[in-house]
Amino acid sequence: MELGISTFVETTPDIKTGKVISHAERLREVVEEIVLADQVGLDVFGVGEHHRQDYAASSPAVVLAAAASQTKRIRLTSAVTVLSSADPVRVFQDFATLDGISNGRAEITAGRGSFIESFPLFGYDLDDYDELFEEKLDLLLELQKSERVTWSGKHRPAIHNTGVYPRPVQKPLPVWIGSGGNQESVVRAGLLGLPLVLAIIGGSPQHFAPLVELYYKAAEHAGHDASKLIVASHSHGFIAEDTETAADRFFPSTQQAMNTLARERGWGPYSRSSFDAARSFEGALYVGDPETVAEKIIHLRKNVGITRFLLHVPVGSMPHEDVMKAIELFGTKTAPLVREEVSRWEASERS
């Protein structure tokens, strides 16, 4: 089982001081976080794309490239790339460049985008939300197949037998589909034989098990070898030396971030009782000491079918030293527990 970190590189006001960290400082911090994740043996680090004041990473590939030359093994992925409002040629070129710098460690996670600020910014109509994604994913996958491409569509000028460079080290450059749980997205990923990332950030993770099953059925129906496909979970969480400390440190920034989204999207306020329910064993928050978080990840593997887990930390803005400690604990204490038990369980399932 692969284990890693994801972040949106937020720059919201510090919950205690009210200070807002600059985009530049937060970007430098996240590079340090990626380097540490590599040092403690985590498998993957993801950076999400946003185009608003309270998020610093509008170009995940650039952030990941800054870390690529300072890391040796960790895979580097977007989390996600808002493909619907991007030019697939530039996306491919950016991540092929990252793949070269990292010597074959780049990945793209393509999503439609739960944040929509990039659509008006780049001149796209939200009425074309689904059509844009389908067309641009089609082009991105064509770019994987061959050096020279001929392609035409509705929302981008046609390409006529044109070479697209640089070419990636990996053949093909990995493309994942990111989904919040939409059945259509899950089926699309399965039919295309692409790995899937599920944003499991609310409710019970157990409710995603039918979607994982649907994904594998779609893949098999299309003739793909389901045993070679991966389903990942992107889930909020935080690790500290003891569970109550983890909860008390993680809640304030999480509440602030969730209430900001609540005001924008018409949700109800986020309370401590909601937070505590979500960090229960059946909930979608992975908050606690290393052993508690390990138990929940193991449960997710055994009962939902997740084979890559991304701990999304921080939610909102937390002190950099707290995030670094959480990454250290994840790599040195939680990850070994998960890997040992999952390896034992998978061996018993095969026998």
Language model region names:
Residues L3, A37, G41, E49, ...:
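Conserved, mostly hydrophobic/aromatic
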Residues V44-A67, V82, I200-G203, H312-V323:
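Glycine-rich, proline-tolerant flexible connector loops at the mouths of alpha/beta enzymes
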Residues D38-Q39, L64-K72, F95, D99-A106, ...:
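Acidic (Asp/Glu)-rich catalytic clusters
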Residues E25-L36, D94, G180-V187, T292-H299:
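Short, acidic/polar
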Residues I5-V9, D128-V164, P205-T307, R339-S351:
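An alpha-helical appendage that flanks or caps ligand/catalytic pockets
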